Amino acid sequence: MNGNTGVVSGVRVSHETASLDELAAASAASTEAALDALLEQPPVEEAFVLQTCHRVEAYVVTADQASGRRALGGAGFNPAGGGAISMGHEDSLRHLLRVAAGLESLVVGEDQILGQLRDAYDAAKDAGGIDHVLREAVTKAMHVGERARTETAINEGATSLGTAAVRLAERKTQLADARAVVVGAGEMGALAAKAFASATVAEIVIANRTPARAVRVADMVSVPAEATTLADARGRLDAADVVVTATGSPEHVLPASAFADAGDTVVVDLAQPRDVAPGAGGHDGVAVHDLDDLEAVTAATRERREDAAREVEAMIETEFERLLTQYKRKRADEVIARMYESADRLKSREVQTAVHRLEAESGSLSADEREVVESMADALVSQLLAAPTKSLRDAAAEDDWSTIATALELFNPEFEDGMPFDASRGGDAASAESED
């Protein structure tokens, strides 16, 4: 990674922009594999991937926007793919804040996205994909998400897909004294199990690839619950009245044949890719619902949270401007640091020349005399650059990068790696939306 402040480019595919098939096609085999693919692209300095059951998002930091888009496409995140939305620097940053606040979730204000963001950040950090640009962006996003939930009512009521799935099932069948099966013992499965318990189902079977996690979830609920394996769960469907699936499996975990004798059963598949194989809904009495069918439940939640959402929107804009200011200050500081480095190199040469001349005329200088010469040179550099430093910071705050470019030409700093912004455009590379 270089010392320059780069540009964020992003691409997203979500429940709002794509069909479930398009979402499945955009999903990577794993977050780690996606990060590796992005970081293998030559221009990529940083990378971040967020992949949940209803969204796939990838972000990279590169020297310019065009390089970022090419890198995303080269790693399999095609900005022109089905349902994909390409994002420039500011759009990417604002979108991350909206995601963390829960405004982009299927269930507005849901809490699980914060944990998913933290996990994605940790994965990116472990892969070597996080430096100061994405660190500041994701940290700011999580800060906004926490503020939104503590300072507004954005997460009141049904606050997860797991809860929404149970609400949908409740509209389709009687849950009191029903027999429920939850497939997947992750956070979403646990929330679905708790929601079933609150709906006073008679019993819950919790299935997971690793039974120990299923046991932990079974111990959390207030109704009779049994933990089992995924393989065993297929034989429990005949007795089930309602099934919610939420695994992270890349393949179907419940074949259509498992529902052949299930009879009247409501199935809500929250997974992406789907847990339930196509054709399951063709059996008599079996009704399979997916993420698209949650709209009726989530729309009601969205309406109840409209006032809170407006408060969060205002909060996001304030924090977004603060984030941009952080980046602008960072870019200005990079230019200023290089200017001082250039001045220090010049100062060192001139001090050495002056000392040699003085010693040639008067003999060796004492340590105190040498210190006087060096202190005078330091003071001159500091005083001469104080006003330009303030002007450069003011110019950065106003996005006046042409002024900074002019100042650089006047001071002629000896940049070895180029400018940390695109001076040829007369503007900040981070806000430039260059075309391929």
UniProtKB/Swiss-Prot annotation:
Cross-referenced PROSITE patterns: GLUTR
CDD domains in the cross-refs: NAD_bind_Glutamyl_tRNA_reduct (cd05213)
Protein biosynthesis recorded as keyword: no
Annotated function: Catalyzes the NADPH-dependent reduction of glutamyl-tRNA(Glu) to glutamate 1-semialdehyde (GSA).
Pathway: Porphyrin-containing compound metabolism; protoporphyrin-IX biosynthesis; 5-aminolevulinate from L-glutamyl-tRNA(Glu): step 1/2
Binding residues annotated for substrate, in chain numbering: T52, C53, H54, R55, S105, E110, D111, Q112, Q116
Name of the protein described by the UniProt record: Glutamyl-tRNA reductase
Family in the record: Belongs to the glutamyl-tRNA reductase family.
GO biological processes: protoporphyrinogen IX biosynthetic process
Active-site annotation: C53 (nucleophile)
Subunit architecture: Homodimer.
Pfam families xrefs: GlutR_dimer (PF00745), GlutR_N (PF05201), Shikimate_DH (PF01488)
Miscellaneous field: During catalysis, the active site Cys acts as a nucleophile attacking the alpha-carbonyl group of tRNA-bound glutamate with the formation of a thioester intermediate between enzyme and glutamate, and the concomitant release of tRNA(Glu). The thioester intermediate is finally reduced by direct hydride transfer from NADPH, to form the product GSA.
InterPro entries: 4pyrrol_synth_GluRdtase (IPR000343), 4pyrrol_synth_GluRdtase_dimer (IPR015896), 4pyrrol_synth_GluRdtase_N (IPR015895), GluRdtase_CS (IPR018214), GluRdtase_dimer_dom_sf (IPR036453), GluRdtase_N_sf (IPR036343), NAD(P)-bd_dom_sf (IPR036291), Shikm_DH/Glu-tRNA_Rdtase (IPR006151)
Site (Important for activity): H95
Free-text comment about domains: Possesses an unusual extended V-shaped dimeric structure with each monomer consisting of three distinct domains arranged along a curved 'spinal' alpha-helix. The N-terminal catalytic domain specifically recognizes the glutamate moiety of the substrate. The second domain is the NADPH-binding domain, and the third C-terminal domain is responsible for dimerization.
Entry EC number(s): 1.2.1.70
UniProt keyword terms in alphabetical order: NADP, Oxidoreductase, Porphyrin biosynthesis
High-level lineage: Archaea, Methanobacteriati, Methanobacteriota, Stenosarchaea group, Halobacteria
